[in-house]
């Protein structure tokens, strides 16, 4: 899975607890 900062196209590309940002990178939901 992709860690924070990894490229993603959907949330499922990221590790558990991470979301896919609009710019295409995984991020922790609690961060803005």
Swiss-Prot record:
GO cellular component, one term: extracellular region
Keywords (A to Z) from UniProt: Disulfide bond, Ion channel impairing toxin, Nematocyst, Neurotoxin, Proton-gated sodium channel impairing toxin, Secreted, Toxin
Location relative to the cell: Secreted; Nematocyst
Main subcellular location of this protein, as a coarse class: secreted
One Gene Ontology MF term: ion channel regulator activity
Cysteines engaged in disulfide bonds, as pairs: 1-15, 8-20, 14-26
Function: Reversibly inhibits acid-sensing ion channels (ASIC) in rat dorsal root ganglia neurons. Reversibly inhibits voltage-gated potassium channels (Kv) in rat DRG neurons.
Protein name: Acatoxin 1
Organism listed in the record: Anthopleura cascaia (Sea anemone)
